[in-house]
Amino acid sequence: DLPRLQYTEMVIKEAMRLYPPAWGTTREAIADVELGDYTLRKGGVAFLNFWGVHRDARFFPNPERFDPERFNPENEKQIPKYAFLPFGAGPRVCIGNAFAMMEAKLIVATVAQHFRFELAPGHPVQPERVFTLRPKYGMRMIARRREHS
């Protein structure tokens, strides 16, 4: 049933757009490279800010708004190739990305069948940038069992 979990995948992608697991990375230039008006010399290090790219209004209108429809099949085609990087890209892309997405879809769909989650009132949501991006104060949630008929 994984192919039928399209909306679940859209929700997960939008969550990773707003809160990418890896919020940035560095790359060392193996040759001189021109980046706009700037020259990065061989051996120089560039920081790639996934967090910033994911919240850039040029790529994602109303970037602070949670909108899974950004990732419906038609809309997703409009996202530039390197504007969505929750697992990195290119030769160093995370080799576990397909497995991680499959696992996330199964977990989210299974749990969401039985529970609704709401953020606890007044609980601050503040990302903390360490090696990975995580909630500084955790995520206090209220779980409510779904009524099944």
State where each predicted segment sits.
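Cytochrome P450 heme-binding "Cys pocket" and the immediately downstream C-terminal segment
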Residues: 98-134
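Conserved, non-catalytic sequence blocks in retroelement Pol enzymes and Pol-derived host proteins
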Residues: 1-6, 94-96, 129-131
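C-terminal helix/juxtamembrane-tail motif
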Residues: 138-149
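Conserved cytochrome P450 K-helix E-x-x-R motif and the immediately C-terminal K′/meander segment
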Residues: 1-36, 57
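Conserved cytochrome P450 K-helix/beta-meander segment immediately N-terminal to the heme-binding cysteine loop
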Residues: 2, 48-76
